[in-house]
Amino acid sequence: MLRALCGATIFTLALSAHAALDIGEAAPDFSAQAALGGKVYRFSLAESLRKGPVVVYFFPAAYSEGCSVEAHYFAEAIAQFEAMGASVIGVSGDDIATLSKFSVQACQSKFPVASDEGQAVIGAFDARMPTRPEYANRLSYVIAPDGKILYYYVSLNPGKHVENTLGAVRAWRQTK
């Protein structure tokens, strides 16, 4: 029994630690329908990178408990990201109507969330959940203004995504 439990734990940890885009690799450019404060617009990663680093965080589904908690944490920390010249966007496979509401409620109208119903962006960033590929994994990337991956963090637990991405932006900022 103990051996099976240890094996399952190691397998789970291996799955949660996977991300195909390595630090220093070019992030895939994308544009997508997004919502900020209930207003729908076209988000462009290239445009956002002209202003500074971008945190692109993927989440499984709007209004699920962990995703709502994570959005709340990012909303509470958005002023800290902005103070360092960084912006944040969440991405999921939810439709834009759902994300439009989510952008007001969970995101508190403080940052946009993008719809990737066809999962093109999720696939390009290797952000599919290994055990449920119809959902995005909880995966956060920090992308430098030159389009290179500075940092990534994978964990289904939403608790450390904000803290870790803030730390990565702060570390990048100190080199500038």
Over which residues does each language-model region extend?
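Short loop/turn microsegments at loop-to-beta-strand junctions
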Residues: P28, P53, N137-L139
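Short active-site neighborhood of thiol/selenol oxidoreductases, capturing the structured segment around
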Residues: L45-H72
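N-proximal helix/coil linker or "cap" segments that precede and/or mark the start of modular domains
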Residues: F11-A34
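Bacterial N-terminal signal peptides that target proteins for export
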Residues: M1-C6
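A short beta-strand-turn-helix
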Residues: S31-P53
